[in-house]
Amino acid sequence: MTTSVGGPSSGSSNLKSSQLAAVTNMLALSSANGNENGGGGSSAPSNPYGRGYDNKPGGGDDNPWKILIYDKHTRAIISPLLSVSQLRSHGVTLHLLLHSDREPIPDVPAVYFVQPTQENLSAIARDCSRHLYQRSHLHFSTRMERPVMEEFARLVVNTGGLDSIASVHDQFVEFACLENRLFTLNVAASYVLYNNPGATEGDMDGAMNGIAGGLFSVVATLGCVPVIRCRRVSLLLTLLLYFSQ
């Protein structure tokens, strides 16, 4: 699914630059609410819908050098925004897939940028229990539901990895921006699913929730409230009902 953002080409409607600002702010190792320790950080505005939790250690400045850990989905989000050299200019010395063999680097902090799936959360908890990195800053591409967050917190505590986590943030950037005002939700095989006579109601609910979450990320990144018009009985109206939840 690839969609363009309408309207005149202006800074306020430049989706790619807005998403880039959110991602570079994430890489600055600064809190979404400001760096309480007074260390350096990006001046780019954070996503107005984002939320975060900081578990800052006492004293010390943020280390500008870091490791970036992503999954295949979030790699597709970052790739159109930042080249390898640009990542290095933001202090990223190494970027690795979450589900790959990774050696411990205990003297360097890590920025995790992944989807909040059960598989990803279990992998992060294992990393924290092994203390692979100095501190871990967790950034999720979309909202992590409260029950999932509570289960993740219990898992981290039970495995002894809580001290490894520096902060947790919802970023709401669940889309890949290909051009200034062109994006894709990277929904695999969506046409097949929607036209599959064997698809269950649960399958359709999950797909619609995913699309609604991606569209919410777009408007959250732009910092605007959309005006959407559609017929009273239509698939778009069904999608908007998911979007409003």
Task: Annotate each PLM feature.
Residues 1-245:
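Extended, well-folded catalytic/binding cores that form a central cleft or groove in large enzyme
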